[in-house]
Curated annotation (Swiss-Prot):
A divalent metal cation binds at residues 399, 401, 403. Residues 121-167, 180-241 are annotated as: Disordered. SMART domains: cNMP, Lactamase_B. One of its GO terms (biological process) is protein localization to cell cortex. It comes from Dictyostelium discoideum. It is found in: Cytoplasm, Cytosol. Its cofactor is Mn(2+); Mg(2+); Zn(2+). Phosphodiesterase specific for cGMP, which is activated by cGMP but not by cAMP. Involved in the degradation of intracellular cGMP, contributes to the control of cGMP signals. One of its GO terms (cellular component) is cAMP-dependent protein kinase complex. Optimum pH is 7.0. Residues 147-160 have a biased composition (Pro residues). A nucleoside 3',5'-cyclic phosphate 2 binds at residues 734-851. This is cGMP-dependent 3',5'-cGMP phosphodiesterase A.
Length: 867
């Protein structure tokens, strides 16, 4: 199995199928469309293509794509849409092992953390519908379950016929309270009507009942203070009254419209022969050795006989569109200048809107970005509008529904470790959910990022601004926040059910504390209010927001809403997406903001990473900001070196011979000739208007002189730049996707070494002290000489063995087929590189080689920056 990845077969689908824009395929059958691969927001593809939203979903061989960071089994919204909107169940076709993993995902996203399911029951009227009656697929708990009867194989009855496109959009955005099993809102209104028509005797009886309810409520609230989990209590400040800590389990269950995840879906499992029987007439065959699925169904021959026909052949490893991250230099050569305090909306809609992205935004503080619930491919979105995502160094994760966390995992795998801000409860759900999807341990996932835990009831300083976080009213633990900076403030609601009637009802039932009720009903005294207006009953009804005073609506921007559901003449407005619509608040900059800007920029420069804090003062005193207009020459070839530069904004192009590289914020240039001597070897020109941080020659040498690590870094880099290391990395299937900064960091840990023909690189059983990038020649594994040889661009090395401490032993023996050249990397250096580049670490994980691009076509690096 060590070499299975090299032997895996990739082919194009064949037969009758529809390819989906976001990835995956839909194959027609007697049972309706069968979808293979389930990427985030996949139902939007069906809606946009005007095809029926499938009820049968086949999970691919790998549930998560390491290359793109995309979840290939995002089954949440297909299940939600079919269950809540179309009133029917879905069927998931997969292996037994995949079923167990998917159940963990739905546990977290539908029911919340396991400790939230202690058996508490919310008393209310119920009219639960058996939705399984409308499902065309019978529940099968194992692959040996009997096939469906002919009656069960029939399409859904007319009442659940697939709606038209217009009906789908209306259904997906209407008030779905009539789907809600508990009818909380209706109960409040009914009670109000009854109170107006009762007799005096009944009024007295009602008053007595209300007094009794109040006593029971107080008693229940006293009991709740001891019911709350001890670990959950630790998320609240020591000054937060223990009696006022919310019972989120009760609040979540009040909003929940089901009692078990099995109400939403069934599983159909592949048997030991790789066959999943959907019915007597329809089967899916999984041929693992060929990496494919086959859809087969029986057709009548006309003589009472049936013949099995092949409908389609689909790859079992779904390829998703690879969003090549490139910084745009269009838009009149202007580069985005982030506000000191403001918001850039990436997406403003929800998971059922085919025309818009799910809600997520960048909160700008001191020109640094904090991404809140990043939508999928959010970095590509920003870069397409001229915003380097290196400007974003924090993520706020509000909760673990797919429309809010799908892009979070992807964002964690980008350049540098990012800081995640959320509560331990929400982070725990996130790690369990994505640990199950990726099949990686939660310990490993936790090491991919820096965690800053939220403390409820206590101010938190992030990027110089003061944050206060709260738990909202939602079906799983969710946070919102308010942030204060420079005399202005922004409030973000997060996903919440802001409905005064229901909030009061929760208090009346003893589900919500009175102090918490008053908190949610308080006025919004903030400069800007960013509030959700999603699909009730678990979101905020637009009618409630429409009734707000005009003074509030002037400061209110809506998210989590589709455009066609905004009532005309309501005085409400949807937050506009894109950099051009960035909302900037006029605030006074902090007296330290300039120094912070410089230090944050210098922090990203490899050369300065080993510089002690005691030299920070020297850096601040010697750094100078310079501006260059578009087209200006910053450095001319064959001139005397006089300064070192760090890009602060804009894009510059470095031209060395035939090699061109675009550099962006945090990239640097001009260091080589300062340290190694000689004239400038490159031309550097401003592609856009540019601002750089410059250090003159004497100051730069003074800062780095006493740092052995800095000098060694530059020396190694100089040696590798005289090699063809950059071109060689561009031939590797993983390194080719690295940013310029990452490639530079890799160059600094490589050492050239000549290997003779038939020389052994390492033997099986030896300690894994190094790996290598093949620069010239070729190598083979003795354990499997039937493989093609590994040539230029291939990386060889047992990554798991190299990255344990101390390194463990090699499982293979590698021999040179001819005289070769390698770029050697020590295990200890690779570990350090991985710690700063978690996405590359995951791409290498569990490998003994990372193959060269099979077509050996070198990626061009002179048109756009791969980022």
């Amino acid at each position: 199995m060590m070499f299975s990845k090299r032997k895996s077969i990739r082919f194009n689908p064949e037969g009758d199928y529809t390819e989906l824009p976001r990835g995956g395929y839909v194959v027609p059958s007697k049972l309706g469309g069968i979808q293979f691969g389930v990427p985030p927001e996949t139902i939007k593809d069906s809606m946009a293509l005007k095809i029926d939203v499938p009820t049968i979903y086949v999970f691919p061989e790998e549930l998560w794509d390491r290359k793109t960071g995309i979840n290939a089994a995002e089954a949440e919204f297909p299940a939600y849409f079919n269950y809540f909107i179309l009133k029917r169940k879905v069927s998931f076709v997969c292996t037994k092992e995949q079923e167990q993993r998917i159940r963990i995902v739905f546990q977290e996203t539908l029911l919340g953390p396991p400790e939230f399911n202690t058996g508490i029951i919310i008393n209310s009227s119920s009219s639960t519908t058996d939705t399984s009656k409308t499902s065309p697929i019978k529940k099968q708990t194992s692959s040996s379950s009997p096939p469906l009867s002919p009656q069960q194989q029939q399409p859904p009855p007319p009442l659940v016929k697939q709606p038209s496109q217009q009906q789908l959009e209306e259904l997906a955005t209407m008030d779905t309270c009539h789907y809600h099993h508990h009818h909380h809102h209706q109960e409040v209104n009914d009670n109000d009507n009854n109170n107006n028509t009762t007799t005096n005797n009944n009024n007295i009886e009602i008053l007595e009942q209300q007094q009794q309810q109040q006593q029971q409520q107080q008693q229940q609230q006293d009991e709740d203070s001891t019911d709350v989990d001890e670990e959950f209590q630790k998320e609240f400040s020591s000054t937060f009254p223990r009696s006022e800590i919310p019972n989120l389990e009760k609040e979540c269950k009040y909003l929940r419209t089901f009692n078990s995840v099995d109400e939403l879906f069934d599983f159909i499992l592949f048997d030991d022969n790789g066959i999943a029987k959907l019915s007597d007439d329809v089967e899916i065959h999984f041929q693992e050795d060929q990496s494919l699925f086959k859809v087969l169904q029986f057709e009548e021959t006309g003589k009472g006989n049936k013949v099995q026909t092949l409908v389609a052949t689909i790859p079992s490893k779904i390829l998703f569109p690879d969003m090549i991250n490139s910084i745009s230099t269009i838009n009149d050569n202007k580069i985005f200048d982030p506000p000191t305090f403001g918001i850039t909306i990436i997406g403003s809609s929800h998971g059922f809107d085919p025309k818009k992205s799910t809600t997520g935004f960048v909160l700008w503080i001191n020109k640094r970005g904090i991404m809140v619930d990043p939508p999928l491919n959010s970095s590509s979105f920003l870069q397409s509008q001229g915003v380097p995502t290196r400007m974003v160094d924090h993520i706020i994760l509000t909760h673990c529904h797919a429309d809010h966390d799908s892009g979070t995992f992807q964002k964690l795998l980008e350049e540098y470790q990012i800081t995640v801000v959320t509560t331990p409860t929400i982070l725990g759900s996130f790690l369990r959910k994505y640990g199950a999807l990726s099949n990686l341990s939660t310990d490993l996932l936790r090491r991919l990022f820096i965690f800053r835990p939220v403390m409820i009831g206590e101010p938190m300083i992030i990027s110089g601004a003061e944050f206060r976080f709260f738990y909202t009213i939602h079906t799983i633990p969710t946070i919102s926040f308010e942030v204060f900076y420079g005399g202005k403030s922004i409030f973000y609601s997060g996903d919440t059910c802001y409905d005064p009637n229901r909030i009061k009802d929760m208090n009346k039932r003893g589900i919500m504390k009175t102090s918490r009720m008053k908190f949610f009903l308080r006025p919004w005294n903030h400069t800007v209010v960013l509030h959700e207006a999603g699909v009730p009953p678990i979101h905020t009804p637009v009618s409630v927001l429409r009734a707000l005073p005009d003074e509030v609506k002037n400061r209110l921007y809506l998210v989590h809403i589709s455009e066609h559901t905004l009532p005309a003449g309501s005085g409400l407005k949807i937050a506009k997406e894109g950099v051009a619509h960035t909302l900037s608040l006029d605030v006074m900059k902090s007296s330290h903001s300039e120094a912070v800007d410089i230090l944050k920029l210098v922090e990203s420069v490899d050369i300065f990473r080993s510089i002690p804090l005691t030299q920070a003062c020297e850096i601040l005193q010697t750094a100078t900001k310079r501006k260059y207009s578009q087209g200006s020459v910053i450095i001319a070839r064959d001139t005397e070196p006089d300064a070192f530069y760090v890009v602060a904004s804009g894009v510059v192009c470095v031209n060395i011979g035939e090699l061109k590289k675009n550099l962006i914020v945090g990239d640097y240039f001009g260091e080589m000739s300062l340290v190694m001597g000689g004239l400038r070897s490159a031309n550097v020109q401003a592609v856009t208007d540019v601002e750089v941080l410059s250090f003159n020659k004497e100051d730069f040498l003074s800062i780095t002189r006493n740092s052995t690590e800095s000098i060694q870094f530059i020396t190694r880099l100089w040696e590798m730049r005289n090699e063809k290391s950059w071109e060689t990395m561009s031939l590797n299937s993983v390194f080719s996707r690295c940013t310029n900064s990452q490639k530079t960091a890799i160059q600094s840990i490589l050492v050239r070494e000549l290997i003779k023909k038939d020389e052994t690189l390492w033997c099986k059983g030896e300690e894994a002290l190094f790996g290598c990038l093949v620069a010239e020649g070729s190598f083979v594994f003795k354990e499997d000489d039937s493989l093609e040889s590994f040539s230029q661009g291939s990386f060889l090395g047992d990554i798991n063995a190299m990255t344990t401490q101390p390194p463990s032993i090699h499982k293979t023996t590698v021999v040179a087929k001819e005289e070769s050249v390698i770029y050697k990397v020590l295990s200890q250096d690779l570990i350090k590189f991985f710690s700063n580049n978690p996405g590359i670490q995951l791409a290498f994980l569990d490998t003994i080689f990372v193959d060269a691009l099979r077509d050996q076509v070198q990626q061009l690096v002179n048109s756009k920056l791969t980022y």
